[in-house]
A protein has these predicted regions:
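An active-site-proximal "capping" alpha-helix that borders the catalytic cofactor pocket
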Residues: 171-185, 245-246
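C-terminal, non-catalytic "cap/extension" segments appended to globular domains
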Residues: 17-37, 59, 228-339
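Short pre-active-site segment immediately N-terminal to the catalytic Zn-binding motif
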Residues: 71-74, 129-151, 164-165
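Short, glycine/acidic-rich hinge or "gate" loops at secondary-structure transitions
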Residues: 54-61, 96-103, 165-173, 189-203, ...
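Contiguous, non-catalytic segments that form substrate-binding/exosite surfaces or channel walls
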Residues: 2-134, 314-326, 330
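Long, amphipathic alpha-helical stalk/connector segments used for oligomerization, subunit docking
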Residues: 185-263
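Catalytic Zn2+-binding segment of zinc metalloproteases
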Residues: 155-167, 182
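Active-site His/Glu-centered metal-binding helix of metallohydrolases
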Residues: 150, 154-158, 175
Length: 339
């Protein structure tokens, strides 16, 4: 009991120290509040623009909310098979974890997975010290959501082998969101090869819905930073993690397909070694507050992608004239970004 109490105190002290230093990095290096204000302003402009184009914003938010259900039905075995094959494309074998709910990673760390209908929320524990067990939880719904949930939570287990640090604190949501976006095209490939008995039209709409749902969630959290809706620095840091994940994932998907996988591996290694600069270099990110032009471009790309996805999702309900007008506007914005 005495050792447990000592370990608990050491864990709390380390977490507090990392938390203070991480908050300093967010404030002084990244200016997370300034970035949140910039994003929030662009989101408000986007909402107004979409209304002009005839998009029913309330309907989109309702259909693509955080708890929205995807229509494509996927049973438990199908979900695990898809996820196993997806990670195998990266040279990562998660078959034992999926089949047995437990495996030891290359560091000897034990990773547990609970994937069932009793799980209340999707989450993965973040160990403080080397060697501590990792527990991932994914709720089973019988839909395509399960595939995304499993990919997201298992991705969290790929970089937590070492001691908790500032890189994991600030950038810990990046890899799971990037893997979700890599999953999008993989699912379409499977459907086109008819390897899964799914309606490809419904699948594509579900994929777009998932992308919108994630973006809406991230931008809502960003809005909380901009509005000062947090009590503690640790709470703001948690919000910033999700804000940055949206930006970094967008940046990865802007890169050439041939380099994405390698960039993900380099980013994972940077998180393991607690090297924020190395992580930024892996994605060719210049996110520091001194890089105003680059930051503006990252924000614009994120907003542009959400606009494109919303218009795709609501395409049949927006008049052709409005869609043409929107396409012209998007093209103009894209050209401005390249200047």
């Amino acid at each position: 009991m005495e050792n447990e109490e000592k370990n608990k105190i050491k864990s709390q002290e380390l977490t507090q120290r990392i938390g203070k230093n991480g908050d300093r990095i967010l404030r002084e290096n990244l200016d997370d509040i300034g970035l949140a204000n910039e994003i929030n302003h662009e989101v408000i402009d986007l909402i107004n623009r979409l209304r002009v184009y005839g998009v029913d914003i309330k309907k989109v938010f309702s259909e693509c909310g955080r708890d929205s259900t995807l229509k494509t039905e996927i049973d438990r075995n199908q979900a695990m098979n898809i996820v196993s094959r997806f990670f195998y494309k990266f040279g990562i074998d998660v078959s034992k974890l999926l089949e047995e709910g437990k495996y030891n990673n290359e560091s000897g760390q034990t990773v547990y997975l609970s994937f069932n209908k009793e799980v209340k929320r999707n989450e993965t524990t973040s160990p403080t010290f080397v060697g501590e067990d990792v527990h991932a939880y994914a709720k089973e719904t019988g839909t395509l959501t399960d595939v995304y949930s499993l990919v997201h939570e298992i991705s969290h287990t790929l970089y937590v082998q070492n001691q908790f640090g500032e890189a994991r604190m600030i950038l810990g949501e990046v890899i799971p969101q990037c893997m979700e976006r890599m999953l999008d095209s993989y699912l379409v490939e499977l459907a086109e090869r008819k390897e899964n008995d799914v309606d490809i039209g419904t699948l594509k709409k579900d994929i777009t819905k998932r992308k919108i749902s994630t973006a809406i969630d991230r931008f809502r959290l960003t809005s909380r930073i901009a509005k000062g809706e947090y009590k503690f620095a640790s709470e703001k840091a948690e919000l910033s993690r999700y804000m940055l994940a949206q930006i970094y994932a967008t940046q990865l998907m802007e890169s050439d397909k041939s380099v994405r996988k390698q960039r993900i591996f380099e980013f994972i290694e940077a998180l393991k070694s607690n090297d924020i600069q190395k992580a930024n270099d892996a994605f060719d990110m210049k996110i520091g507050k001194e890089h105003t032009k680059e930051r503006a471009r990252y924000v614009s790309n994120s907003i542009w992608n959400l606009q494109k996805d919303v218009l795709t999702f609501q395409g049949n309900e927006v008049s052709k004239e409005k869609r043409d007008e929107t396409t012209r506007t998007i093209s103009e914005e894209e050209n401005e970004l390249e200047i």
